[in-house]
Amino acid sequence: MATWGRRRAGPGGRERVALAAGECYIVHEIYNGENAQDQFEYELEQALEAQYKYIVIEPTRIGDETARWISVGNCLHKTAVLSGTACLLTPLALPSEYSHYVSLPAGVLSLACSTLYGISWQFDPCCKYQVEYDAYKLSRLPLHTLTSSTPVVLVRKDDMHRKRLHNTIALAALAYCMKKIYELYSV
């Protein structure tokens, strides 16, 4: 864990800045009775809805589940973007008689991933967060008070541009697929 004060290694020799009181919430791993896991989930849900900049999840099980949920959302987003891009760029790279064998499935995959992301993740408060792995950013957090050695740290990020990107690419892929299907079956 990094020390308070001036950072010796890393880009620019930035100084450590203390966080404001309302920027970080810690879900502590304190077992008080049989419903401890439910209490952890409730605390996490409240912290997500309160939109803290950083959320530190100390309980291992709920931290791992949250990190997995976020990584599945990230995978759907990346798959939608990459397959949509492949759908749109394949006709430029392959001969026209073969391009639809790659571009149509890629377009359908992009649309499916974008739709699934929109249905499952769009309204989930967890989609606004990413798991933080950067040691410098983690050193700014009050992790010295934790009892767990492997907490999951979530950082709130604006995902508006991300959603616009994958929705735009998926819609462009849909338009291309509709045009290509019309051309294939109208001839």
From Swiss-Prot:
Under InterPro entries, the record lists: TMEM11
**Membrane topology summary:** Multi-pass membrane protein
Q: Name one GO cellular component term.
A: mitochondrial inner membrane
Q: Name one Pfam family in it.
A: Mito_morph_reg
Location in or out of the cell? Mitochondrion inner membrane
Q: Which residues cross the membrane?
A: 79-95, 102-119
Member of which family?
Belongs to the TMEM11 family.
Put simply, this protein is called Transmembrane protein 11-B, mitochondrial
Protein's gene: tmem11-b
